[in-house]
UniProtKB/Swiss-Prot annotation:
Protein name, per record: PqqA peptide cyclase
Needed co-factor(s): [4Fe-4S] cluster
Occurrences of domain Radical SAM core (ranges): 7-227
Enzyme Commission number(s) of this protein: 1.21.98.4
GO biological process: pyrroloquinoline quinone biosynthetic process
PROSITE patterns: RADICAL_SAM
Organismal lineage: Bacteria, Pseudomonadati, Pseudomonadota, Alphaproteobacteria, Hyphomicrobiales
Family of this protein: Belongs to the radical SAM superfamily. PqqE family.
Naturally occurring in which organism (per UniProt): Methylocella silvestris (strain DSM 15510 / CIP 108128 / LMG 27833 / NCIMB 13906 / BL2)
Reactions catalysed: [PQQ precursor protein] + S-adenosyl-L-methionine = E-Y cross-linked-[PQQ precursor protein] + 5'-deoxyadenosine + L-methionine + H(+)
């Protein structure tokens, strides 16, 4: 038997304030069954969550959704996070933000903004987002963010429809005044797995996009930081998902369920505790879902005897379940997995000529109107 797993305090909290969103991105990682507005935590409950997070040692509060700007109490939430010493990062589509609201958020103590873009070309970007005018609106929001003195990161998800413009998206981020850009190839969870056939690029597309972005590191050294999340379907080893299950971060859903990762609900049989019934401290240290895949005792072969088991932790549990039906199995991305042929077949299909044509998206459900000020 291995020694008991040492559980350190978390450093990050992803707060999904709402699932409401005016966009309908086909790669959205939100669950297929979206939480309703009526079921969301109220302001007082979220304030309690952030207070407990700070007491637990959390340093960073990532305010996400859906679209967090759909919450009328967003400024109040940011002000409270600042008052308890949390660094706040707003992850937003920009839709629902005005120049006045951004200034109010900055005055309340907001530390950072991450703004998503869907492409470097307006027509394609709006098509991907399922929202006409989104591209133009995001450029205005970026200008308002930098005018308010807030540091800006631009996020771009790469897939078949925009892979040829990965480098242009880096250049767009520079033009928008961002200090950092995250170029992330699609991770297939939530709506992303529904749309995998439409989203997955060919290997040639992925390789070209990766090379283009990597070449820009030297071009823009000292100008912008480039974070690059490459696709794992063409890799030999799996990603160290979340840095290991329930090791660094936790996620609170709009209704108060606390998850080890945003896709954990896709694994059946896990018991998720809710902030309405338990403190964050109790959830982090004692909840069954958080302890399900901590350490290495749960691992099967080939992970159990693998020298990389403390490096990639067997890969992603959610992906393992999605592709094998067994959350304890090795992530099939790994070339040592007995199920690796499933990943290879999916990647090979993306390379076939008939699969490389445009496939209609199944857009993310439940589009909410932009909230009134």
């Amino acid at each position: 038997m291995n020694a008991p797993v040492k559980i350190l305090n978390p450093v990050g909290l992803l707060a999904e304030l709402t699932h409401r969103c005016p966009l309908a991105c086909p790669y959205c990682s939100n669950p297929l069954e979206l939480d309703s507005r009526a079921a969301e935590l109220d302001t007082a409950a979220w304030i309690k969550v952030f207070t407990e997070a700070a007491e637990l040692g959390v340093l960073h509060a990532h305010l996400s959704g859906g679209e967090p700007a759909a919450r009328r109490d967003l400024v109040e939430i940011v002000a409270h996070c600042a008052s308890v010493g949390l660094y706040t990062n707003l992850i937003t589509s920009g839709i629902g933000l005005t120049q006045e609201r951004i200034k109010a958020l900055a005055d309340a103590g907001l530390d950072h903004v991450q703004l998503s873009i869907q492409d470097a070309e307006a027509k394609s970007a709006d098509h991907i987002a399922g929202y006409e005018g989104a591209f133009a609106r995001k450029q205005s929001v970026a200008a308002w963010v930098t005018a308010a003195g807030l540091p800006l990161t631009v996020n771009a998800v790469i897939h078949r429809a925009n892979a040829e413009r990965a480098g242009q998206m880096v250049k767009l981020a520079v033009a928008l005044g961002a200090r950092r850009v995250e170029i992330a190839h699609t991770q297939y969870y939530g709506w992303g797995i529904v749309n995998r056939a439409a989203l997955m690029p060919t290997k040639a597309q992925a390789d070209a996009a990766i090379a283009e972005v990597e070449a820009l590191r030297e071009v823009y050294a000292g100008v912008i930081v480039i974070d690059h999340v490459i696709p794992d379907y063409h890799a030999r080893h799996p990603k160290a998902c979340m840095g290991g299950w329930a090791k660094r971060t936790l996620n609170v859903t709009p209704t108060g369920k606390v998850l080890p990762c945003h896709a954990a609900e896709t694994i059946p049989g896990l018991e998720f505790w809710n902030v309405r019934d338990h403190s964050l401290r109790d959830v982090w240290f004692a909840s069954p879902a958080f302890n399900a895949f901590r350490g290495t005792e749960w691992m099967k072969e080939p992970c159990r005897s693998c020298p990389r088991k403390e490096i990639d932790f067997g890969g992603c549990r959610c992906q393992a379940f999605a592709l094998t039906g067994d959350a304890n199995a090795a992530d099939p991305v790994c070339h040592l997995s007995p199920d690796h042929d499933k990943v290879a077949a999916i990647a090979a299909h993306a390379n076939e000529e008939e699969a490389a044509t445009e496939i209609a998206y199944v857009y993310r459900g439940v589009k909410a109107p932009v909230p009134a000020e």
